[in-house]
Structures are given as C-alpha cells and as structure tokens.
C-alpha cells in the first residue's frame, strides 16, 4: 500500500545517504579525493 511505498522510499533514501557518507569518509581517510 501507500505506507509500504513511503517506507521503501525512506529506506532507499537512507541507504543512499549512508553510502555517500561512507564514500566521503573513506575518501578522507585514504586521501583519494
């Protein structure tokens, strides 16, 4: 239903944000940016 799709969108948005944070963090640690 509607709640499920909203939940799914929130989860995938959260995953995307986490992946971006991890990319930035590893980039800073490895100094590869």
UniProtKB/Swiss-Prot annotation:
Keywords: Amphibian defense peptide, Antibiotic, Antimicrobial, Disulfide bond, Fungicide, Secreted. The keyword Disulfide bond applies. One of its GO terms (cellular component) is extracellular region. It is found in: Secreted. InterPro entries: Antimicrobial_frog_2. Expressed by the skin dorsal glands. Its main location: secreted. It holds the Pfam family Antimicrobial_2. Disulfide bonds join 27-33. Coiled coil: none annotated. GO terms for biological process: defense response to bacterium; defense response to fungus; killing of cells of another organism. Shows antibacterial activity against both Gram-positive and Gram-negative bacteria and against the fungus C.albicans. Has no hemolytic activity. Belongs to the frog skin active peptide (FSAP) family. Brevinin subfamily. This is Nigrocin-1. It comes from Pelophylax nigromaculatus.
């Amino acid at each position: 239903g509607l709640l499920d799709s909203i939940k799914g969108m929130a989860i995938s948005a959260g995953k995307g944000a986490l992946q971006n944070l991890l990319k930035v963090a590893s980039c800073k640690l490895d100094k590869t940016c």
